[in-house]
Design a protein with these regions (language model features):
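Conserved anion-binding
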Residues: 12-16, 51-54, 93, 99, ...
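Glycine-rich beta-to-alpha transition loops that act as phosphate-gripper elements at the mouths
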Residues: 10-11, 83-91, 107-110
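A structural motif
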Residues: 38-41, 80, 101, 124-125, ...
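Conserved, mostly hydrophobic/aromatic
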Residues: 10, 36, 40, 44, ...
């Protein structure tokens, strides 16, 4: 049995480094979703806030207004598609999980919003923990004499924190 999954990305931002706002218009976003599914994607990651170096915060209500209609559209055409939400905001995560997302992709590793792990646990969802410490959010910089040690320590702490909320680290 092949466990390989094709993951599609849908950036709903004007300042995305990968697609420069191509999917701000909902009809373009829907066409892109249809195309990703036709090409075999079984997992779609949706984000409404860029996290490229020097990004600006997008308020929660704007993120929700962009993402919820997309989740509803995906679920209306294919219930089997796994949906992850790329957000650092627990309020966005909470509403998106209520509407059918099952995974939160938090580039900050849950360090931006102290309620994130609680929300993920409440929904028995999965979380992708990224590395974007606060000191790196405004510039693309990481200084370490031993990068592997630094990252291992960072992720060990995040995983331990997630486990204290009952989040299964084997998912």
């Amino acid at each position: 049995r092949n466990k390989t999954k094709l993951i599609g990305i849908l950036n709903l931002t004007t300042d995305s480094f990968s697609d420069a706002g191509s999917y701000i218009d909902i009809s373009n976003a829907k066409k892109h979703i249809d195309q990703m599914i036709e090409q075999g994607c079984t997992f779609i990651d949706i984000g409404a806030e860029s996290t490229k170096p020097g990004f600006r915060d997008i308020d929660v209500s704007t993120q929700i207004k962009k993402i919820i209609p997309i989740i509803k559209y995906i679920k209306s055409i294919n219930q089997e598609i796994s949906i992850s939400i790329d957000t650092r905001a627990s309020e966005v995560a909470d509403l998106c999980l209520e509407h059918g997302a099952s995974i939160i992709n938090d580039v900050s590793g849950s360090t931006h919003d102290e309620q994130m792990l609680s929300v993920v646990s409440k929904h028995n969802a999965e979380i992708i923990l990224g590395h974007l410490p606060k000191e790196h959010q405004k510039k693309d910089l990481m200084i370490s004499s031993d990068i592997l040690f630094t990252l291992t320590k960072y992720f060990d702490q995040l995983i331990s924190a997630a486990e204290t909320y009952g989040i299964d680290n084997t998912k």
